[in-house]
Each structure stands twice: as structure tokens, then as C-alpha cells.
UniProtKB/Swiss-Prot annotation:
Biological source species: Chlorobium limicola (strain DSM 245 / NBRC 103803 / 6330)
InterPro entries given in the database record: Aldolase_TIM, TAL/FSA, Transaldolase_3B, Transaldolase_3B/F6P_aldolase, Transaldolase_AS, TSA/FSA_arc/bac
Active site: 91 (schiff-base intermediate with substrate)
Protein name (record): Probable transaldolase
GO molecular function list: aldehyde-lyase activity; transaldolase activity
Pathway note: Carbohydrate degradation; pentose phosphate pathway; D-glyceraldehyde 3-phosphate and beta-D-fructose 6-phosphate from D-ribose 5-phosphate and D-xylulose 5-phosphate (non-oxidative stage): step 2/3
Gene3D superfamilies: Aldolase class I (3.20.20.70)
Localisation per UniProt entry: Cytoplasm
Amino acid sequence: MKFFIDTANLDEIRSAAELGVLDGVTTNPSLIAKIVGDPSNFTYGDFKEHIRRICEIVDGPVSAEVTCLKAEEMIAQGEDLAAIHENVVVKCPLTIDGLKAIKHFSASGIRTNATLVFSPNQALLAAKAGADYVSPFVGRLDDISTDGMELVEQIVTIYDNYGYPTEVIVASVRHPQHVVTAAMMGADIATIPYSVIKQLANHPLTDAGLTKFMDDAAVMKK
């Protein structure tokens, strides 16, 4: 299983990369907004420069999302984003216009990530249109009392049934169990907030054992 980090924070990306477990990055407009003090002073050029800086840190796919709704506009912006760096993957929402853009990018050799996916039908359409990645948002489904991980299982089964090469990125991850369950289901990738990446390393018995070892080591003769 591959681990992506779901953030636009450069310090978090660097810290995750230092752990040796980072395979890529996903961003979206909301994550970009979190790191911008005053959005009115953050230009599209600033956005592209920020994506470029992320690509310099991580040697892997970096998803950058389009910020328009019409297919023609998505295509124009997506081509511009893809030109930033060879690792850029263009994120398109799973809409009718998004599918048109994904089809265009697939034919042009530009990698895509179909995002805001909440149903197996949407995931099937994404694969047929040629998306390289599909991002089911499990946490947001859990928020409305729906089993987000059941959707992941359905998508993995459908893709396995027909041999679709589209990789499943489990997104909107809220806690370590999302990651573990995704791995058990055979999802290709989990994109994880930095806080959850750190939680994956924690266990109370590890802490207790370390405390005991250090206490015992302290009484040993130097």
C-alpha cells in the first residue's frame, strides 16, 4: 500500500518525507486555503508556485485540483497545472464535465485523479473515462451515517472484476483504523493527514515498554 499525505503544508510534507513512508501528496483548494493567511492576496501564480515547491520535496505524484466547473475550463487549467512538473496529477471532480476533462487528459497523457467520489457508480465512470486515480471520501460518508469503507470495498471489487488499472486513493481519512481497513481491503493508496500518520506509529504498550526499558537502563552501571 502507498501512503500519500493529504496537506498543502510544506513543513508537514517535509516531516512525513523524513519518515521514509511517503509516496505522494494530495492537495485541494480547502487545504491550500488553510495555509494562506489572506486568500485575497494569494494569486493563481502563487498557487502554481506552491505546487512546484511541493514537487521539489516529494518524488511522487502530487495532485493539484482544478478550480473551475466547465470541461473546457478544466482542460485549460489542467494543462497549465500539468506543465508545472512531471509529477503533477490533475484532480477533477466526478461530474459530467469532469468526466469530459478526464477523457481529454487521458488521451493527452496527462494523469488524473477523479475526486469527490461518493458512490460505486461514480468510481466506475471514472475508470471507464481513463482516470489514473479515484478518490472515495470515506470520512465525509461516515459523517452522514454511511459506511465509507464499504464504498472502498465495492470499488476495489469492481476494479478487480474488470481489471481496471485505476488506483484507489482512500481519502478523507480521519483515524488510523481507516488506513488499516483500507489496507485489508486491498486499496492501492491512502492519503492521510499528518496528524493521522503520527497516530499510526503510536501504541500505549510501546510507550509503556519504552518507559520500562529506559528505567532499567538508568540503573545499569556506566
